[in-house]
UniProtKB/Swiss-Prot annotation:
EC number: 1.17.7.4
Amino-acid positions noted as binding (2E)-4-hydroxy-3-methylbut-2-enyl diphosphate in the UniProt annotation, renumbered to this chain: H96, H185, T250, S317, S318, N319, S379
InterPro entries tied to this protein: LytB/IspH
Natural source organism: Picosynechococcus sp. (strain ATCC 27264 / PCC 7002 / PR-6) (Agmenellum quadruplicatum)
Active site: E187 (proton donor)
Annotated family: Belongs to the IspH family.
Protein name (database record): 4-hydroxy-3-methylbut-2-enyl diphosphate reductase
Gene (name only): ispH
Length: 403
């Protein structure tokens, strides 16, 4: 399928919207009321620090809603305003934040259900309005909705679209796209639908395995079994790794994506030599500014003498998980929560460890004075961060917190 031609055609459709509907000012007021926070602004104005009682909060200098997320949510709100009576769907969570998604449900926006691992579009009818979320949708989903005569509201983040353009360039020039990401993540699923031949790699360990295969060969079936579900149909590691271009899921760790790019560039240099490198490796620049800024701010934050760290964001949020990784790698006790509701009172917290299930921790706030770092993922509103910080202050002021 010529995905570029399809997108070009869709862009000219009278049923396709990407710029909003003229309700920007009204929606901005709603967004401010529902998602912004006077407490968080106070902390910003106080050099990102606030002390109350025995607790000093250190807030990361870049955190929370990124521009792409704010844009997507605002467009969803505008869509409801512009189509007050039409049935509105969103193909996935609009962003990875439960409070925002629940708010859309309150506005009578329907979410496409997943049945046996596949999205069920059977309830979507001609004339329905369908919102594509911030991390995009597959080209096949777009085609289905277009063929069904739906009104499509595309809130895909421009940084994600930039990655799609990169993999389409790879496809046009017969390069295999090496995509640094999680093959099940909605953004990577969408990105791979625009690619030709592709292989999704989670981390540098997997990249090193592929590098070794490129340079020294190996058992083809073992390779295919190792990366099952993470490559394009018909992918052959013996033929499809001679020409590669690197792209990424925008929420992955910047440093790891850069290392992966350098690793494959060096691999092709070793295999084909400096005179042939440009025919076998395509450079990239698809790292999202907002992701980078939040990670850089987190690296700065963990340099402080923190007693513990609280990372706030959806449990399925990739960018939030990577912020948590930074704290864990510095051996800072760190708690990933998705809302203030996870602070259960009596000095008990329900949190999600890296690569683990939600667990309950008692006496998580030690006695005495505490320095607590706080950050949040790109899909987390300031109001949610405020709720968490306020509950920490209240919890620490209670006798139970000192047990």
């Amino acid at each position: 399928m010529d995905t570029k031609a399809f997108k070009r055609s869709l862009n000219h459709s009278e049923n396709y919207y990407r710029q909003g509907f003229g309700h920007k000012d009204e929606v901005a007021g709603m967004m401010t009321s529902e998602y912004q926070s006077s407490l968080i602004q106070e902390i910003r104005d106080n050099n990102y620090e606030l002390t109350r009682g025995d607790v000093t909060i250190y807030l990361a200098e870049a955190f929370g809603f990124c521009w792409g997320v704010e844009r997507a949510v605002a467009m969803a709100y505008e869509t409801r305003k512009h189509f007050p009576t039409e049935k509105i769907w969103v193909t996935n969570e609009i962003i990875h934040n439960p409070s925002v998604n629940n708010r859309l449900k309150e506005m009578n926006v329907h979410f496409i259900e997943v049945v046996d691992g596949d999205k069920d579009f059977s309830g979507v009818a001609n004339g329905d309005v369908v919102i594509l979320p911030a991390f995009g949708a597959t080209v096949q989903e777009m085609q289905l909705l277009n063929d069904r005569g739906c009104t499509i509201v595309d809130t895909t983040c421009p940084w994600v679209s930039k990655v799609w353009n990169s993999v389409e360039k790879h496809k046009k020039k017969n390069y295999t796209s090496i995509i640094h990401g999680k093959y099940k993540h909605e953004e990577t699923v969408a990105t791979s639908s625009f690619a030709g031949t592709y292989l999704v790699l989670l981390n540098l360990e997997e990249a090193e395995y592929v590098r070794n295969y490129i340079l020294h060969g190996g058992d083809r079936q073992t390779f295919l079994d190792k990366f099952k579900n993470a490559y394009s149909e018909g992918f052959d590691p013996d033929k499809d790794l001679d020409r590669v271009g690197v792209a990424n899921q925008t929420t992955m760790l910047k440093s790891e994506t850069e290392q992966m790019g350098k690793l494959f560039e060096q691999t092709m240099l070793e295999k084909f030599g400096p005179t042939e490198i440009n025919d076998h490796f395509m450079s990239f620049n698809t790292i999202c500014d907002a992701t980078q800024e939040r990670q850089d701010a987190m690296f700065d934050l963990v340099e402080k003498d923190l007693d513990l760290m609280v990372v706030i964001g959806g449990f399925n949020s990739s960018n939030t998980t990577h912020l948590q990784e930074i704290a864990v790698e510095r051996n800072i006790p760190s708690y990933h929560i998705d809302s203030g509701d996870r602070l259960l009172g009596n000095n008990v917290i329900a949190h999600k460890p890296l690569d683990g299930e939600i667990t309950t921790q008692t006496h998580w706030l030690p006695a005495g004075k505490l320095k607590i770092g706080v950050t949040s993922g790109a899909s987390t509103p300031d109001k949610v961060v405020e709720d968490v910080i306020a509950k920490i202050f209240a919890e620490k002021a209670q006798p139970a917190a000192l047990v």
